[in-house]
Structure formats: structure tokens, C-alpha cells
A protein has these predicted regions:
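Alpha-helical transmembrane segments of multi-pass membrane proteins predominantly involved
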Residues: 1-487
Length: 487
């Protein structure tokens, strides 16, 4: 078959974000010997420009919506939403990284190149229409993330977190790939739409094989989104990794993994939903409960936010349990809101942690409202959104998820989710009380002024959080139009 029959100009346009990110990641590596890393922010500037170009490329690719490369990729509203989201997360990761890398004397091209490669993998995950392409995107993103977690080579905590992340991540990937093998063996295809057709056809394979495949993939993806009972890696990795990397891991890879979670289970496995639904609601309940109650006992803010991340994965799993387009749209909205509020909170942690990241405890935030009222106000917005207070993105995110659950008659799961949200309010409010009601700690008393990059890293997520809380309809409308995944 001629290459021209497989690849055309439209295919290149649909693949544009991944091309830009991959090429620019390589360009950064080539420029490393040329640029004076100690006196220049050039790596960060090039990375930001690359991400902005990829963002524009994602929007432009949507004008050529359709399948690419023989159906291996699909550019639709769902893919575009998550492409834009993970690239935005990348931009918000680079902004606080300027000071962090300079403070740790760790400014190299590798950091930014790995970030671009990881985001390229996440974009591929969002647009993949075949299980093998999903696997490739997953591995590109994961391998880059493993290295980023251990980027500070002289930090024992970072090395330990990277090793745990790599070992457990590889184990989870094995489960996912084994599930792919079961699906291919039973249906003869790895195309998601073709798998759906095979499971609904007259010669549908044995439900035993497809059920095992769904369970294996659930285990692999459950690890990637840090959902219970596969969450054990998250607190240690989030605490040990460099804080900007932790912010990135908590938002970008999680959003991309949920994108393929919904793409696979709401497309390929939709005909056997009665089989996998119990797995999802059990995981949702465990994630919300374990995450929130474990967070109550944390003194380290990064560990607290790690357990909070587990709980928020549970809320998204509630949307998946709903098994509806409304639930998918609600999850899309929630992941966008969560990305803004979580990455903003980690940006504040990065700002206060100091050289060597020694200030990470809740008590270290004492007096922040007195010493840096703007920083405290930004963190307050993020924490209130994580609670789900009205006029924030977190409120409408939870509202739409629980609304979708009620429409699917999941009353008991909705009630338990609301109770868990009440529990979560305690540990978020505790941090607010410490910031405003206590005398300044050494960390806040000696905190450096906000740099331009950090100001942007705080104001942009805060703006996104408030916009989604005050004007949620424009995002929700697009998510609603993009939520029907069965092609």
C-alpha cells in the first residue's frame, strides 16, 4: 500500500501537537551544550513557546477533526479537550520551575525536554483510537515521568520516589498490556470501535475473556490515576519528587490516564458495563474514603495533597460509575477544575519550601496571611475549590458529578461522596486556619518575594478556578458535545 494512502496532509495536521512537542524536546537536548545554563532562562522560555505552539496546534487540529493514520488516532472534541488540558498543565508546571531549578542549581535541558516528551505522550493517549497506540502514549509519558521524579540525583528522597514509581508503574503497565493481549486474542482487533462492535455482534467472545481483560486494564489504569486500592505509590512519590514535578504528576498524567480510562471503558467495554461497574464503584468508594481519612493525619503538605489526589480520583470514578454521557462530561469538567486548583496549590508549596525543600509541613505555613497576603489569598482560593465551595470550579465539578450519579440512580454512592467531601473540608480548613490565625513561622518570615513566573503560576490557576466557578457553562457545553465516545 502506498504511503500516500496511509499518511496525508490532514493526518499531519491532526498529529501536529505531538510533532511539535517531540521535535522541540529534541531541539532542547541539542541546544544544551550551546546555552549557558547558569545565566539564562532560555530552556524555560523555549519550553513555554513550544507548549504555546502545541496548544495552538491542538486547536487547529480540531478544524480537521477525524481519524488519522488508518484509524489509529482520532481527533474529536474529547481528544482536543484533554490535549489542551495537559498542555496547559505543562505551561503551569514550567512557570514555577524557573525559580525551583535555579534555587536547586539544577537548570538543564533534560528537565524541560522530559517535560515535553511526557506531554507528547499524554496528547497521544488522549487521541489514541487503538489499544497499542494507547500503550505507546502511556509508556512515553510514564518513562519521562519516572525520570522527572528522580531529577534531583543527589536527593535521596527523589531517588527513592523515582525507584518506587518506576517499579510499581512497570508492574501496572504489565497488567494493562496483558489485558490488551486478552482483548486481541478474543476479538482479533485492538481498535476500540471494532472491539465494541465485536462485543455486540452475533459472534461475541466469551464474557470470561473480556471480563478478565477489563479487570486487567482496570488494574493498570487504576495505578496511573492513583485510585484505591492501587494508590500506595502516590504519597511517597509526591513527597519525594521535586515539587513542580509533583504538581505535574498530580494533574497532567492523571488527566491523560482518565481520558483513556473513559475512552476504553465507555467505548470498547460499554457492552459489558454490568461486569466492570462493581470494580469502579468499589474503587471510587475506597479512593474517597482512604484518601480523605488518611489526609486528616498528615503533617506534610505534599503528602496531604497526595492523599487528597487519591480522594479526587474517587470522585472522578463516581462519574465513570454513572456510565453516561452526562457522567463523562462531568468528569471532563472536574478534571479541568482539579488541574487548576491542585497545580496552583503545589506552586505555593514550591514557593515556600526553600532550598532543599525543607519547609513542607502544615506548621510551616503559619502566618502566611500576614507576610504574603497575596500568596495566602491564592492558596485560599485553591483550598476552597478543593473543598467544593460555591463560586469555584471545584463546586461545580462535584455538583455535576453527583448530579450524573443521581441520574443513574446511584443515590448511596452520592451520599457517601458528599459525606467524604465534608470530611475533606477539615484538613483543608486546618491549613487555612494555620495561615491566618498563627504567628509567622521561619518559612513564611523568610519567604522570598514572588518572581514573575511564580506570580503567573498562581494567578493563572486562580483565574481558571474562579472562571470555571462563575462561568461553568462554556466548558460544560463543550464537554457535553464531546462526551459521546461510541463512534
Amino acid at each position: 500500500m502506498p504511503v500516500s494512502n496511509f499518511v496525508n496532509t490532514a493526518d499531519i495536521i491532526r498529529f501536529l501537537p505531538e510533532i511539535i512537542l517531540s521535535v522541540m524536546g529534541t531541539v532542547l537536548m541539542v541546544l544544551d551544550p550551546i546555552i549557558n545554563r547558569r545565566s539564562s532562562n532560555a530552556f524555560g522560555h523555549i519550553t513555554l513557546l513550544s507548549l504555546v505552539a502545541a496548544l495552538i496546534g491542538s486547536v487547529y487540529a480540531y478544524t480537521e477533526a477525524g481519524t488519522a493514520f488508518g484509524g489509529m488516532l482520532v481527533v474529536d472534541g474529547f481528544a482536543t479537550f484533554f490535549r489542551v488540558l495537559v498542555i496547559a498543565v505543562g505551561i503551569l508546571t514550567v512557570l514555577p520551575s524557573y525559580r525551583f531549578l535555579r534555587r536547586q542549581d539544577a537548570e538543564t535541558s533534560e528537565y524541560h525536554a522530559l517535560l515535553l516528551y511526557s506531554i507528547a505522550g499524554q496528547c497521544l493517549m488522549a487521541s489514541a483510537n487503538e489499544l497499542i497506540m494507547i500503550f505507546l502514549g502511556l509508556e512515553i509519558s510514564s518513562i519521562s515521568s519516572y525520570i522527572l521524579a528522580g531529577y534531583l540525583r543527589d536527593d535521596k528522597r527523589a531517588n527513592e520516589s523515582a525507584l518506587k514509581y518506576f517499579l510499581l508503574g512497570s508492574f501496572a503497565t504489565g497488567f494493562f498490556l496483558y489485558g490488551v493481549a486478552f482483548i486481541y486474542g478474543s476479538t482479533g482487533t485492538v481498535n476500540l470501535s471494532a472491539v465494541h462492535a465485536a462485543l455486540t455482534g452475533p459472534n461475541a467472545p466469551s464474557p470470561v475473556f473480556t471480563g478478565v481483560a477489563a479487570a486487567l486494564m482496570f488494574v493498570g489504569l487504576g495505578f496511573k490515576v492513583s485510585a484505591s486500592p492501587f494508590q500506595v505509590w502516590a504519597p511517597d512519590v509526591y513527597q519525594g519528587a521535586p515539587t513542580p514535578v509533583t504538581a505535574f504528576l498530580s494533574a497532567g498524567p492523571k488527566a491523560a490516564a482518565f481520558a483513556i480510562f473513559f475512552r476504553i471503558f465507555m467505548t470498547a467495554f460499554a457492552p459489558i458495563a454490568n461486569g466492570w461497574e462493581p470494580l469502579v464503584w468499589i474503587s471510587a468508594l475506597l479512593s474517597m474514603t482512604i484518601g480523605n481519612f488518611a489526609a486528616l493525619m498528615q503533617a506534610n503538605v505534599k503528602r496531604l495533597l497526595a492523599y487528597s489526589s487519591i480522594a479526587h480520583a474517587g470522585y472522578v470514578m463516581v462519574a465513570l460509575t454513572a456510565r453516561s454521557d452526562v457522567g463523562t462530561a462531568a468528569a471532563m469538567f472536574y478534571l479541568a477544575a482539579y488541574a487548576f486548583m491542585n497545580i496552583g496549590a503545589f506552586a505555593v508549596v514550591s514557593h515556600l519550601s526553600g532550598k532543599g525543600e525543607k519547609y513542607q509541613n502544615v506548621d510551616d505555613f503559619a502566618g502566611l496571611g500576614q507576610k504574603q497576603p497575596v500568596t495566602a489569598a491564592m492558596l485560599s482560593i485553591f483550598l476552597l475549590s478543593l473543598i467544593g465551595v460555591p463560586l469555584t470550579g471545584g463546586f461545580f465539578g462535584k455538583f455535576y458529578i453527583f448530579k450524573a450519579a443521581l441520574e443513574s440512580h446511584l443515590v448511596w454512592l452520592t451520599v457517601l461522596g458528599l459525606l467524604n467531601s465534608a470530611v475533606a473540608a477539615y484538613y483543608y480548613l486546618r491549613l487555612l486556619v494555620v495561615m491566618y490565625m498563627r504567628e509567622p513561622s521561619d518559612a513564611t518570615a523568610n519567604a522570598e518575594p514572588l518572581t514573575l513566573g511564580l506570580r503567573a503560576a498562581l494567578f493563572l490557576p486562580a483565574l481558571g478556578t474562579l472562571v470555571l466557578g462563575i462561568f461553568p457553562s462554556w466548558v460544560l457545553e463543550f464537554a457535553g458535545k464531546s462526551s459521546n465516545l461510541v463512534k
